[in-house]
Amino acid sequence: MYHDVSYLLSRLINGPLSLRQIYFASSNGPVPDLAYQVDFPRLEIVLEGEFVDTGAGATLVPGDVLYVPAGGWNFPQWQAPATTFSVLFGKQQLGFSVVQWDGKQYQNLAKQHVARRGPRIGSFLLQTLNEMQMQPQEQQTARLIVASLLSHCRDLLGSQIQTASRSQALFEAIRDYIDERYASALTRESVAQAFYISPNYLSHLFQKTGAIGFNEYLNHTRLEHAKTLLKGYDLKVKEVAHACGFVDSNYFCRLFRKNTERSPSEYRRQYHSQLTEKPTTPE
């Protein structure tokens, strides 16, 4: 098999290497000593052979995809030769690797990186895939999301990296600043001061470059982290709110319901009830 990254992406998106079952790795419970665990989300795709993965609780065969959320883990048990294609979604770049287990040792067949630039298409697709963990039986939808994510990866590989304009570069720097400090008491004024610009220019920058308001982006970032805490930790709603930068837990609950049509407690219960449902067989 030819192991060029762009070639593999095209074959997975358009065939003949069609996507089969989408599995979701564990993000709860004790992590085995030899398990793979990183702080960024990733996809593990089987190209050839098969193996048992403890994190997925299943035997993966060619075309199967294992989605490992940020902080999640997987633990492949190699019993026969197999080849996998991994995509790591780092904050600043994507990492691609093709690894083969020949029965005795690992061999790296391909490795490539590309910068994550421009609109946050990949980030929103990953958020959608995180939500799919609540409904793993919806396999057709999960396959379409993964295919879209792989298509986005191929677009990044195929595009010419252009130097960002000054306003675009500033917007991305501010966005990263918010992503790292969302739990702090951020305001439009404090963020503007950190970058030596006026609050009005900050608002203009978000509307023009990001097509989203500053407060809207800040709240969205905090709510996404709140969802992660609600799903993975047994914290009180008030503790989740404060951990994500919301001073007023009542405001957090109103905002959460407005964005999800569920209260934080309902969201947590639905997530855990979905996890207990047995996934259906591949369509």
Curated annotation (Swiss-Prot):
It comes from the Bacteria. Keywords: DNA-binding, Transcription, Transcription regulation. Residues 189-210, 237-260 bind DNA. InterPro entries: Homeodomain-like_sf, HTH_AraC, HTH_AraC-typ_CS, Tscrpt_reg_AraC-type_HTH. PROSITE patterns: HTH_ARAC_FAMILY_1, HTH_ARAC_FAMILY_2. Residues 172-270 form the HTH araC/xylS-type domain. One of its GO terms (molecular function) is sequence-specific DNA binding. Pfam families: HTH_18. This is Uncharacterized HTH-type transcriptional regulator YijO.
